[in-house]
Amino acid sequence: MLHPFQSVLLNRDGSLLFCVVKNEIKAFKVEGNGYVLRGEWVDDLDNTPLIKEKVLKEQARQLIENASKKLKTNDGEPVAQPKKQAKVPKPGPGAPPVYQYIRNLALSRDGKLLLACTDSDKAAVIFNIDLDDKDNIFKLIKRQPYPKRPNAITTSVDDKDLILADKFGDVYSMPIQNDVITSINAEKAPILGHVSMLTDVNMLTDSEGKQYIVTADRDEHIRISHYPQSFIVDKWLFGHEEFVSTICIPEWSDKLLFSAGGDKFVFSWNWKTGALLFKFDYTDLIQKYLTSDHLAPERFQNEKGDVIEYSVAKIVTLKDVPYIAFFVEATKVLFVLKVDEKSGALSLHQTLEFDEKIVSLTSALDVNTLCISLDNRDNQDCDLVKLLLLEGDVFIEQKDTNSQLMNTIRSTLKSDLIANVEAGDVYPLYHNASLRKHGEHFS
């Protein structure tokens, strides 16, 4: 079977679709009446040297720490210890598999750069998109490793700096065109930090052109900080009671911000004042789409075993129409909400059901198009992606366009050894559930 796309990303005019399958990125471009493959990149980095370097550093640290504990002869002379060769640790029997993820695809604001994060070396990878190259549009600019795994990525408003948030709560800002920094902690300090895993990051500008950085974390926090003086906190947006997984800032409003995550609501904020404007409760809407996939882990179940947990995976918007779209992780439904631009109130506008579970969601801002990727494990003949166009005031599936796109995708991936897998070898597709905190995290 073909591996589902873990992530999809459209550029602003919808002419480029970027897809992640396991540890490779594919780029499909609209040409004529269909799509063609215009770029591909595989993360084939061997991280063995990186692991060995860490082992050597740890051995050196232990030698220094234990220097005073060396065995000594009766004369007080230290006993020479045999030197140990650094060995790369290998997972033992029963150890969980190690996946070489590519995650967090993003485009620069001018659409000329593609950003991605790799798990193999905890790096941000930056590509120039060269549409003049008919063979491969991906031109690697730099690969910047970080101390901890990147969780979210964007660029500054002028696209000069890479903004990256990691799983330990630190945010880094680095010039995109500068050389790779070999030792980040020594050469580049974080510009701000949370005391919790960061889940999303974005940038804002006010009417005076001042930049702000917005960060969300696992501990219900949304922080708005000045940029580049990010040590100055402008405000916090308080109201979430569970983790925040996604934040969305529409271009058609100069004050609204939307967020969601482990709560049963989609939140609407005035980011300028910090006011919570509206909470859209989707609890009743989602009930019939929940399955055994949403049962809480056994150790957190009640006696009946019917505790369910679910969360919003992604919110997106469009350029100049007051709608937002979101989906709940591991469900087969996409909700479109209408936004009152003055009050920030949210109301259900459209419900779109699909035969398979949604994995990821993106939008082409300028052409009012949504794109989803689907989990095809239960139906290997289903489309891996679907495009939905706003016609009038409703989103309509573009069946002819989708058929052309899927023909290109299937023919492209037919002989791709990475993309063709057994159903049991599919990478984990749903990650939000692991963000939820239970009693064990508070004890």
Curated annotation (Swiss-Prot):
Its main location: nucleus. One of its GO terms (biological process) is tRNA (guanine-N7)-methylation. Residues 67-93 are annotated as: Disordered. InterPro entries: Trm82, WD40/YVTN_repeat-like_dom_sf, WD40_repeat_dom_sf, WD40_rpt. It is found in: Nucleus. One of its GO terms (cellular component) is nucleus. Keywords: Nucleus, Repeat, tRNA processing, WD repeat. WD repeats lie at residues 97-137, 193-235, 239-279. Pathway: tRNA modification; N(7)-methylguanine-tRNA biosynthesis. Forms a heterodimer with the catalytic subunit TRM8. Belongs to the WD repeat TRM82 family. PANTHER family: TRNA (GUANINE-N(7)-)-METHYLTRANSFERASE NON-CATALYTIC SUBUNIT WDR4, WD40 REPEAT PROTEIN 4. Required for the formation of N(7)-methylguanine at position 46 (m7G46) in tRNA. In the complex, it is required to stabilize and induce conformational changes of the catalytic subunit. This is tRNA (guanine-N(7)-)-methyltransferase non-catalytic subunit TRM82. It comes from Kluyveromyces lactis (strain ATCC 8585 / CBS 2359 / DSM 70799 / NBRC 1267 / NRRL Y-1140 / WM37). The lineage of its organism: Eukaryota, Fungi, Dikarya, Ascomycota, Saccharomycotina.
